[in-house]
């Protein structure tokens, strides 16, 4: 529970330019001692520069869907974790602001399957209990984050973005605009992967620029920081490279979204398609799921394949 993982991404924009960004991964923390240890790991991964302030954007991939087998949604986990992290931040000698945000992270297609097919067939065993746990609606629940939390992260990102140099703002304006569109729609798992990716891209741009007084640490995790998180990090690695290259070339990222907000393959060039094929590896998800629950695929794998990328023939 107190492990902190550091995911590094190196993105080759062209032969002359390579970008690097990082994400800190950690599980939900349920006590102050664990939160202190996790926070120490997060701060240790903040860029080493002269900016005196740090802001932590903590994206929690949890589910607001009401569950039958367990005691409800994962709201209690979210409330406890964020309370412990806020308390731990207050104890630090330096200025660290903690801004959490919940992102829906259960596939609604799998929920529908659990209601109709899987639960009756898998009548016994832990697998059926876990699958059926998410089968009580509503499918599209209200986000675990309230309106004040959403407004806070919007305001903070806007403040950080306006501190950027004008040329950097112009380059990343499409990413910022799309981020602002998605931040209000995180009660649907379709938006979780692209939102996480855009948060990483904008935070990297903020950290790279000498303007401003604040570093941004992007933290991601579900309950355990394993299967759901790995699913989203893999989606991030695919999208971040694609988005960054399009932003560098002045090409649209909006065309990568269809009218319903899902990933659109139609605008991909042959080179982009090959790049995505190289970046996607289903074995990463299978290994994660097998390690976590003993199965090569489960409902959490579908966060990637049945949500934003549901129209992609993997």
Which functions belong to the PLM regions below?
Residues 1-221, 231-314:
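Cys-dependent protein tyrosine phosphatase-like superfamily
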